[in-house]
Structure formats: C-alpha cells, structure tokens
C-alpha cells in the first residue's frame, strides 16, 4: 500500500456524517392558582374558580417565563384564570390571554370521590390511604381513572406536542396530577414514585427535551421542580 493510499484512507475515516444539531424544547409547567374551596372538598375535575388576587405573585411568575411561548391550558377554568392573571401582571405574555386548550392535561378523574369531604372519603374507602395523594397510583376511584392511566394520557400528549412544536418554549398551565405525570414521563420513573413530588399552587416545573438521533424519543432534563416566583430570574 502506498503512502498516498494511507493518507486517503485516514482522511476518509475522519469524514463522518455530521450529527444533526440537537433541538431543545422547553416545557414550563405551572400549577393553577389556589381554588376557592371553603369546605375543602375533593374537587379533581370540578370546575371551580381560582383565587388570583395576589398581584405580587403573578408579577413574579410573569418575570420567570419566556417571551413568545406557546401557551396551553386544561379545559378547566382555574387554569385559564391563572394564565389571564399572569398576562395581566405585565401584559407581555400575549398568548396567555387565550391559551390553547389541551384536554389531555385535565386533572385526574376521581369519579364518585369528587365532591366528598375527606371524612366522607375515609368512611367510604378506608383502604385507599396514600400519604401524598388520594390513592395509590394503580387504584381507580369508582367511576374514575387511576394515576397510572393519567400518566399514560399526559405522556402521549407531551410526546405529540413536543414533536409538533420542537424548538419552542411551551407554557402549560395545568394541575398537580398532570405535572407529576409529566415528571414521571420525563424521568422514566414509576407512577407511584412520581406521587412523591410536591407541586404547589403557582409553582413552576421546567422540563427540557433534547432531540437525539441516537436515542428514540430524545433526552429529558429536569431544570426545576416546584419553583415558586422570586427565587430565579427569567432566562
């Protein structure tokens, strides 16, 4: 073999197919404002109003969020009221005025448990106890859905929307259950373990998706969980 052929061979080895640039899609999850629920009943999918009177809180939220994001909300009014309060804080987040409704981001369906007080629920089903949620992830309330099912529902919507809006910022105003479900999907953890996440009203959870040609479904990074306004600055 000649020296020229060796050089040609070595050069060819260095000429690899370029790897496509990774596309980052950032999800900004916001749990809705506190509901007006003086009797402290299980509300789940109940369409209760939210208390959005804390102006300083929404100023802080507005400062955390990116400009020109796609805004999504569940079908329930408390998520839309929360989005409107964020828009009203500085007028900058124009798309928050009319967020796109995403049915798959609605709260878990608690079936016959919805509307009960906690004492009534205990009397009806003493075995359903869970330290952080209404029931274990696998258990379906009578006439409702399990948290396992909720995770599958939310995961499918996230995958669909991440593909459709790759490279964008997506703000999703939703509920405690769907945000825990999003964490389960991004981290690839069991639904039961995801119930251990604390998700406060008006907190922000950010999940970043990176496309990866070598890994189907891409890679997820958790940038913040349950972050309340006033502790971080908008990027």
Regions inferred by a protein language model and the residue ranges of each:
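Phosphate-handling substructures
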Residues: 49, 89-155, 224-226, 234
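Generic structural signal for well-ordered alpha-helical scaffold segments
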Residues: 59-63, 151, 155-163
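Active-site-proximal alpha-helix that buttresses catalytic centers in soluble enzyme cores
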Residues: 2-12, 22-94
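Short beta-strand scaffold positions
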Residues: 73-74, 152, 173-174
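Generic beta-sheet signal
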Residues: 27, 69, 168-174
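GST superfamily/GST-like fold recognition
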Residues: 176-180
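Acidic, low-complexity terminal tails and accessory targeting/binding regions
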Residues: 2-26, 88, 108-120, 163, ...
